[in-house]
């Protein structure tokens, strides 16, 4: 996970190569965008989607970066930006009858979450 810092107390964390479709991650990110850190964690804990685990890891990382690098408390953080980008697609083939092979596409994505201080 990479970390960058802006001048106005924003901290960013990125997870690359997550084995999940960007569309499935985007429907979870839309629910937590703009919320406070603690509220977003609670939402992620009770949502029934597989994408919640890597998103919560990135959110934990962004909060740890904010605490370590800027000295911000986790209670004073809010999610200013949450986005997902398409990553490389791994292409595999499934053997089928009579010597055929059907393509299997394994999509990956890149999750970016930026947190900022509320105050």
Swiss-Prot record:
GO terms for cellular component: chloroplast; large ribosomal subunit. One of its GO terms (molecular function) is structural constituent of ribosome. It is found in: Plastid, Chloroplast. Gene3D superfamilies: Ribosomal protein L22/L17 (3.90.470.10). One of its GO terms (biological process) is translation. The keyword Zinc-finger does not apply. InterPro entries: Ribosomal_uL22, Ribosomal_uL22_bac/chlpt-type, Ribosomal_uL22_bac/org-type, Ribosomal_uL22_sf. Coiled coil: none annotated. It comes from the Eukaryota. Keywords: Chloroplast, Plastid, Ribonucleoprotein, Ribosomal protein, RNA-binding, rRNA-binding. HAMAP family: Ribosomal_uL22_B. Belongs to the universal ribosomal protein uL22 family. This protein binds specifically to 23S rRNA. Part of the 50S ribosomal subunit. This is Large ribosomal subunit protein uL22c. It comes from Mesostigma viride (Green alga). The gene is rpl22.
